[in-house]
Amino acid sequence: MLNIDLTGKRAFVAGVADDGGFGFAIAKQLAEAGATVSVGTWPPAYGIFTKLIQLGKIKNSLVLARGGDLKFERIFPFDADFDTMADVPAEIRENRRYKEHSDYTIQGVADLFVKEFGEKPLDIVVHSLANGPEVKKPLLETSRKGYLAAVSASSYSFVSLARSFGPLLRPNGAFLNLTYLAAERVVPGYGGGMSSAKAALESDTRTLSFEVGRKYGARVNSISAGAWASRAASAIGFIEKMVEFSRRNSPLGQSIEPLEVGNAAAFLLSPLASGITGSVVYVDKGMNVMATPVEV
């Protein structure tokens, strides 16, 4: 029997703040395969997420099919907008949701991994992060500040993650990020520079597959996930319509489930995918192949 076995592997999933998104599903399926999992949570959501766990509000979501419950090794406050604390503006440092944490930057969390778990503590790093403050604006109406903020948070953050966490990976490590079809097709309403950010993320995946592969011996891949009405995606404003559109028009006539993205991620991050790097893998019920809606 061919099984995905991640026993003895340690993973970090950046971008988990509830139990409803792809990041949580990936973390859970990595744990199902035997990995030890830590997550990074946006500081303003950190207290809420940790309380949800402590109070048992998401206990059903933590139940593993193999038995037992998902227990995160660590939940790190994590803001991928900042590489180091020197990059954090004073108004953020003094914000009550940030000031209780000593370091929540990309390099800071990488350093904490080494401090707590020693040299080369990781095997898997997942980037499940995106933010576009002007996502509801058409590209023509997007400000320079909003556009650059989308690219910084949604794509450059992966470059920074690879730079800071690459040295922490043990042999045959793997990186993974999440993209969306808007990187290559027009999705009206998905604005604010987010389509550009996803296109950059996919391009960076290819470039980093070479650079990270040669420097750290690690693989770098991307999953292009179908539309899903997560709490984070609700910021787009029309996500429910996109989910229904995908259900009606995908080759399988279904909408995606987070578990399916989690399963694909577990495979891509496992030794079974040792020959796959620099790839964008579609997990969208085949929506990416459709040129027109079913009913034109």
In which residue ranges do the predicted regions lie?
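Conserved mid-core segment of classical short-chain dehydrogenase/reductases
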Residues: 51-150, 167, 183, 189-190, ...
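Conserved SDR Rossmann-fold cofactor-binding beta-strand/turn motif
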Residues: 219-229, 269, 282-284
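Short C-terminal tail/terminal secondary-structure segment
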Residues: 266, 277-296
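Catalytic loop of short-chain dehydrogenase/reductase
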Residues: 15-24, 42, 130-215, 224-230, ...
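A conserved structural motif in NAD(P)-dependent oxidoreductases
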Residues: 101-104, 250-261, 272
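Canonical Rossmann dinucleotide-binding motif of NAD(H)/NADP(H)-dependent dehydrogenases/reductases
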Residues: 3-47
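Short, small/polar-rich loop/turn modules that mediate ligand/substrate recognition or access, typified
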Residues: 217-219, 276-278
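A glycine/serine/threonine-rich, flexible loop-to-helix segment
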Residues: 54-55, 192, 215, 222-251, ...
